[in-house]
UniProtKB/Swiss-Prot annotation:
Subunit structure: Heterotrimer of UreA (gamma), UreB (beta) and UreC (alpha) subunits. Three heterotrimers associate to form the active enzyme.
Keyword Disulfide bond found: no
Protein name, per record: Urease subunit beta
Keyword Cytoplasm: yes
CC per GO annotation: urease complex
UniProt record similarity statement: Belongs to the urease beta subunit family.
Species, as recorded: Acinetobacter baumannii (strain AYE)
Pathway(s) it belongs to: Nitrogen metabolism; urea degradation; CO(2) and NH(3) from urea (urease route): step 1/1
Amino acid sequence: MIPGEVITPETDIELNVGRETLKVVVANLGDRPIQVGSHFHFYEANDALQFDREAVKGFRLNIAAGTAIRFEPGQSREVEIVALAGKREVYGFAGRVMGKLD
């Protein structure tokens, strides 16, 4: 083994197995691109993004850690989101929750 080497299985690695997921259509009504990161509480994303905010409270994008999705101006696309896990407490971001989700 080489220091820092990561040995992974030959098979695909599934993300977020067993967690609740939703598909939501998101439109960028703004005049600039908007990028949302993998672990950002989607409910608190930029207000220029139009989608059912109450339906996505407690969810984040279902993409690999450290990646993001970019929404171009005028673009509408369907994305998959996944329920937050752990204590299900949200602090920071846009400051709209600042506590327990459930």
